[in-house]
């Protein structure tokens, strides 16, 4: 029931103020005063009575104790990326992705299409041409083998090291960890996940035909041994149905070689990739997927030119000497046209096949370019090197021509080493050549045009030397050699060599 009051001032009975709602004074109903005097006395007593405070508690939401599990979240939408219930945290920032979430993947790294085996950074970057291109390669950090993902991102080449966890040995680069490299690559590529700083894997580069599997190569007879490994006669299986091809195989020593030495070994293959000429040894491919690393090349069933010249059983004829020098000039000219400097032209690096075709081989020191400057120690073929190389470390097509003159000396002295009898070795010989105190001389009868080529190839100044094209032109004019395009093999056409008379004898140079 509401009490009446002035208009607009309605208040329910027994309504208390805000403070009265929070704090209430208690007294018994039978002590309620009736008279004004009693009421005043009651008020005095009430003032002396202590007030009891009754605080109404605010209801609280029940807390979840540590032993209680939180309510389950709603089931996620079906997605490979949201399948977190199967994932296990490896570290705070890593999540292990199970194999069934990745999907079907070829887990043998050797068969993975984007894996290129052992490869140097420079060789790798030459293959990355478009934005998003990537490949996986093997390298060495200290004595430990590691895998690197190389990516072309915008205008930069980025090399991301694949790391491994300590306990489970899982592979990771940024956030997710996997049981294999192949799963890591497949997951990031399929789901467009950044492999590093926002970079995604767009286009994987497959291996080329010259990147061979070790299982394709069979090693047979050992033919020799070099600085980095051995040379074997072997066979190469090019396809399931084709017969094996007889090849020469250079194998790299598996022990005690640094990553830089392995890269130097493979530099020969890198130079040979684009070469194809009848007077240059044919390149089949490399095996870099696993040890041993191998370079597979054409097998020449003859000897090296050096062995042929030194042979006492069968002397090299005058006609064949000219033929071999012509073949060598054609091979060198082809290399220079491809901007390749051989840097080790010598009879030991010229191979002969059963058809007496000479082929330039051994590209271990070769470099791409027209001219380079390189200062390095080690064992250098001083007796074949040009003065500018010995003095300043300059290599060019002209320095190859200077070495071609040394090859001519070997041919016409039946395999003698240049400066063999001068009594100087090493640094003493180097200083004598630089100081013009000694020069190479052929003390035998030479055809006039051969003597002229020799003299012009051994000029001290690079600009005074003859070029490979000029040498070939002289051979064609004097002897009549030419190239038959249908077979790509050089043949001797004109029938007789110019007669050599004593009056035509012209020493190319005189030892001082």
Swiss-Prot record:
Probable non-receptor tyrosine-protein kinase which plays a role in spermatid activation (spermiogenesis) in hermaphrodites. It is an enzyme of class 2 (transferase). This is Spermatocyte protein spe-8. The keyword Secreted does not apply. Its EC number is 2.7.10.2. GO terms for molecular function: ATP binding; non-membrane spanning protein tyrosine kinase activity; signaling receptor binding. PROSITE patterns: PROTEIN_KINASE_ATP, PROTEIN_KINASE_DOM, PROTEIN_KINASE_TYR, SH2. Residues 1-85 are annotated as: Disordered. It comes from the Eukaryota. GO terms for cellular component: cytoplasm; plasma membrane. SMART domains: SH2, TyrKc. It catalyses: L-tyrosyl-[protein] + ATP = O-phospho-L-tyrosyl-[protein] + ADP + H(+). Residues 217-485 form the Protein kinase domain. The active site is at residue 344. Expression is restricted to male germline. Belongs to the protein kinase superfamily. Tyr protein kinase family. Fes/fps subfamily. It comes from Caenorhabditis elegans. Keywords: ATP-binding, Cell membrane, Cytoplasm, Differentiation, Kinase, Membrane, Nucleotide-binding, SH2 domain, Spermatogenesis, Transferase, Tyrosine-protein kinase. Residues 114-205 form the SH2 domain. It is a peripheral membrane protein. Changing residue 405 to D: In hc108; self-sterility in hermaphrodites but normal male fertility. Residues 68-78 have a biased composition (Pro residues). ATP binds at residues 223-231, 250. It is found in: Cell membrane; Cytoplasm. GO terms for biological process: cell differentiation; cell surface receptor protein tyrosine kinase signaling pathway; spermatid development.
């Amino acid at each position: 029931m509401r009490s009446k009051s002035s208009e607009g001032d309605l208040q329910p009975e027994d309504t208390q103020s805000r403070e009265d709602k929070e704090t209430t004074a208690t007294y018994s109903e039978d002590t309620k005063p009736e008279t004004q005097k009693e009421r005043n006395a009651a008020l005095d007593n009430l003032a002396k009575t202590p007030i009891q405070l009754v605080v109404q508690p605010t209801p609280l939401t029940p807390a979840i104790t540590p032993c209680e599990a939180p309510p389950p979240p709603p089931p996620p939408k079906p997605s490979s990326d949201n399948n977190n219930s199967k994932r296990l945290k490896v570290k705070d920032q890593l999540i292990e992705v199970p194999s069934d979430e990745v999907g079907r993947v070829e887990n043998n790294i050797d068969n993975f299409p984007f894996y290129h085996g052992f490869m140097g950074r420079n060789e790798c970057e030459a293959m990355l041409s478009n934005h998003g291109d990537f490949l996986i390669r093997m390298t060495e950090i200290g004595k430990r083998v590691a895998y690197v993902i190389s990516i072309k991102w915008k205008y930069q080449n980025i090399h991301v090291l694949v790391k491994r966890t300590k306990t489970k040995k899982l592979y990771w680069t940024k956030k997710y960890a996997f049981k294999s490299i192949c799963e890591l690559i497949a997951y990031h590529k399929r789901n467009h996940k950044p492999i590093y700083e926002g970079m995604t894997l767009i286009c994987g580069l497959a291996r080329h035909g010259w990147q061979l599997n070790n299982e394709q190569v069979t090693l047979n007879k050992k033919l020799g041994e070099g600085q980095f490994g051995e040379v074997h006669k072997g066979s190469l299986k090019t396809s399931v149905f084709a017969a094996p091809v007889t090849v020469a195989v250079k194998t790299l020593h598996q022990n005690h070689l640094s990553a830089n030495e392995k890269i130097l070994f493979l530099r020969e293959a890198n130079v040979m990739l684009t070469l194809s000429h009848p007077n240059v040894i044919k390149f089949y491919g490399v095996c870099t997927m696993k040890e041993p690393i191998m370079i597979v090349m054409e097998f020449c069933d003859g000897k090296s030119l050096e062995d042929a010249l030194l042979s006492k059983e069968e002397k090299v004829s005058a006609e064949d000497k000219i033929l071999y020098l012509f073949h060598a000039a054609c091979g060198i000219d082809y290399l220079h046209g491809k901007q390749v400097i051989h840097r080790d032209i010598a009879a030991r690096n010229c191979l002969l096949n059963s058809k007496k075709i000479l082929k330039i081989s051994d590209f271990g020191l070769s470099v791409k370019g027209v001219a380079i400057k390189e200062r390095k120690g080690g064992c250098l073929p001083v007796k074949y090197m040009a003065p500018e190389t010995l003095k300043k470390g300059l290599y060019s097509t002209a320095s190859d021509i200077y070495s071609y003159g040394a090859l001519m000396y070997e041919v016409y002295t039946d395999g003698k080493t240049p400066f063999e009898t001068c009594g100087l070795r090493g640094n003493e010989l180097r200083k004598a050549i630089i100081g013009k105190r000694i020069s190479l001389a052929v003390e035998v009868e030479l055809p006039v045009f051969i003597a002229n080529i020799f003299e012009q190839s051994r000029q001290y100044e690079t600009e005074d030397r003859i070029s490979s094209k000029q040498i070939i032109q002289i051979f064609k004019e004097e002897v009549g050699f030419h190239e038959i395009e249908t077979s790509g093999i050089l043949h001797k056409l004109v029938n007789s060599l110019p007669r050599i008379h004593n009056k035509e004898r012209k020493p190319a140079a005189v030892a001082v």
